[in-house]
């Protein structure tokens, strides 16, 4: 997390995070970085603090890296894309991209997706210094993934993720290798 960038207490930071994330999800759908690049350019033109500029530039770099990985490795599904984002530690964006799948999923798949969304939330909370909230969310995530993870068409390194969540390992595991 960029020092002094707090989307929980700073409305402008929240707007920046949400705008960039929405544009990035659109770029993933379009398979074109234009949406997030244009959004970042507009945000960088505003009168914003150095920490907000650093956040935007950091996100731009990670978004470009993810788009490149997705293109070069032929990653097709949203679920597979979410693990590329996970490995880039884009946990808010993992939540955003999986939420669309979760809304249309049913049964065990829906529960498993909720478990993954909560797993991303664990690392968002840890980065914000909310260990107590992360512990509660990790327990819910572990239960959902243990009971329903097999319903996902693609779930690399599930054991590693479950171990990290159970032990609340502060450094998130790489899930794609």
PLM features: what roles do these ranges have?
Residues 98-99, 118-119:
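Hydrophobic, membrane-inserted alpha-helices
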Residues 1-93, 100-104, 147-177:
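N-terminal alpha-helical interaction modules that lie
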Residues 123-126, 136:
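Extended alpha-helical scaffolding segments
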Residues 130-149:
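TPR/TPR-like (Sel1-like) alpha-helical repeat modules
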């Amino acid at each position: 997390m960029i020092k002094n960038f707090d989307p929980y207490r700073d409305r402008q930071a929240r707007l920046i995070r949400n705008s960039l994330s929405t544009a990035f999800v659109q770029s993933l759908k379009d398979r074109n970085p234009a949406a997030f690049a244009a959004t970042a350019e507009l945000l960088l033109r505003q009168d914003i603090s150095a920490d907000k500029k650093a956040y935007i530039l950091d996100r731009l770099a990670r978004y470009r890296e993810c788009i490149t990985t997705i293109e070069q490795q032929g990653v097709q599904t949203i679920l597979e894309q979410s693990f590329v984002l996970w490995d880039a530690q884009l946990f808010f964006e993992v939540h955003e991209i999986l939420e669309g799948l979760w809304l249309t999923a049913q049964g065990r798949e829906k529960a498993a997706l909720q478990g993954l969304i909560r797993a991303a939330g664990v690392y968002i909370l840890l980065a914000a210094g909310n260990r107590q909230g992360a512990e509660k969310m990790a327990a819910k995530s572990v239960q959902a993934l243990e009971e329903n993870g097999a319903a996902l068409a693609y779930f690399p390194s599930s054991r590693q993720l479950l171990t990290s969540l159970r032990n609340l390992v502060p450094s998130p595991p790489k899930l794609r290798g």
